[in-house]
């Protein structure tokens, strides 16, 4: 299966209103799709996110010339070379070559990986809670209410981007709106030190619906993570920027996390992403993929979760949920899956089992201008 053509699709959308987290406001969303085509006509799609000018130059000047003429079945060695140049680009290539392998074998991605344990996966609605409005709390509450009406039973909201007192006011308002039957995840984006993060414990002891506390501290403080995990009454999660299982090993060995959160687009390819999930099972901790930046990478996270052994024997709580971006972002619809009552059914067709929405691709193609 010789690679004969590679197409690129840099996509850009400027937001109507900025939204954000503790790292600041987002004013646009981007996506970079690639399509690898073999001499037999079998194709596969990949996705990554980074600064579009750098990605486009990297693909057109180096990665595409390197891949042309290579065998699509040599995924591991090709991805290993590309990750030395650009890790996120390597992840996109990994996805595309995985789909080609599945189509060549006349099966789905899940079947290529040995088959699925389950037909559907739970997802949680992921919010960027902060806005530049003085009434940001009421706006956040309205956004959450709208998604709860669509059937979501788990949500993730942001903390750590404003004063502790104001964050508490925000979460109390959401608790009043959502009720204790809705699982709530709090994501601090590494904003705190250990003392500030521990202040939340007084509220965790009252709120019975907290799913986990996500990335409360920078990861250069593993001893504080271990201490915090031992003292909090809710699970501690994190690791969305880890590049592979080797970076998780010291964190898991020191018992820093209850839940690891690898991201398909942040690790060194889909194979290492799956290695991260399996590593969690070996250490007896949970794995809930971070999947905020792209719909195709989220689909691969869903495939991997479908093929992952259960973490528990508890009925209706044996597999961890996957993140589902519900903010303004047209690229979330590049893949035509939609949750129903907080669950997503896994496609069964060949390859990824669905088509890329070319209408969205054509509408939002980046024109090369500065942003």
Curated annotation (Swiss-Prot):
Endpoints of the signal sequence: none
Species: Bacillus subtilis (strain 168)
Cofactor binding summary note: Divalent metal cations. Mg(2+).
Entry keyword annotation includes Isomerase: yes
Catalytic residue list: 158, 290
Disulphide connectivity of cysteines: none
Enzyme Commission designation: 5.-.-.-
Family the entry assigns: Belongs to the mandelate racemase/muconate lactonizing enzyme family.
UniProt-listed PANTHER family: ENOLASE SUPERFAMILY, MANDELATE RACEMASE, MITOCHONDRIAL ENOLASE SUPERFAMILY MEMBER 1
Gene Ontology biological process terms in this record: carbohydrate catabolic process
Enzyme class at the top of the EC tree: isomerase
Record's keyword terms, sorted: Isomerase, Magnesium, Metal-binding
Subunit structure, as described in the record: Homooctamer.
Protein name per its UniProtKB record: Putative isomerase YitF
Swiss-Prot/TrEMBL cofactor(s): Mg(2+)
One term of GO molecular function: isomerase activity
């Amino acid at each position: 299966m010789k690679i004969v053509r590679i197409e690129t699709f840099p996509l850009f959308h400027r937001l109507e209103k900025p939204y954000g987290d503790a790292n600041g406001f987002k004013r646009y969303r981007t996506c970079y799709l690639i399509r690898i085509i073999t001499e037999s006509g079998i194709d596969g799609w990949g996705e990554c996110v980074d600064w579009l000018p750098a990605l486009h130059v990297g693909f057109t000047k180096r990665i595409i010339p390197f891949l042309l003429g290579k065998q699509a079945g040599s995924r591991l060695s090709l991805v290993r070379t590309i990750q030395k140049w650009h890790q996120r680009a390597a992840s996109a290539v990994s996805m595309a070559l995985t789909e080609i392998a599945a189509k060549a074998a006349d099966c789905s991605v899940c079947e290529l990986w040995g088959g699925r344990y389950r037909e559907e996966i739970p997802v949680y609605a992921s919010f960027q809670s902060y806005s530049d409005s003085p009434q940001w709390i009421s706006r956040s509450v309205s956004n959450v209410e709208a998604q709860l009406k669509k059937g979501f039973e788990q949500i993730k909201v942001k903390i750590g981007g404003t004063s502790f007192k104001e964050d508490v006011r925000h979460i109390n308002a959401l608790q009043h709106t959502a009720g204790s039957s809705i699982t709530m995840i709090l994501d601090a984006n590494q904003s705190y030190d250990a003392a500030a993060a521990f202040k939340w414990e007084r509220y965790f002891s009252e709120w019975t619906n907290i799913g986990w506390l996500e990335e409360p501290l920078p990861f250069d403080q593993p001893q504080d993570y271990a201490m915090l995990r031992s003292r909090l009454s809710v699970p501690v999660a994190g690791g969305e920027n880890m590049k592979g299982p080797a970076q998780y090993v010291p964190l898991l060995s020191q018992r820093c996390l209850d839940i690891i959160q690898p991201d398909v687009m942040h690790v060194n390819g889909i194979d290492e992403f799956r290695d991260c999930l399996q590593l969690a099972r070996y250490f007896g901790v949970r794995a809930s993929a971070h999947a905020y930046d792209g719909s195709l990478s989220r689909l691969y996270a869903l495939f991997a979760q479908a093929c992952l052994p259960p973490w528990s024997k508890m009925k209706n709580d044996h597999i961890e949920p996957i993140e589902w971006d519900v903010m303004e972002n047209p690229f979330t619809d590049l893949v035509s899956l939609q949750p129903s009552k907080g669950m997503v059914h896994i496609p069964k067709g060949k390859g990824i089992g669905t088509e890329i929405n070319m209408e969205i691709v054509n509408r939002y193609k980046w024109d090369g201008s500065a942003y």
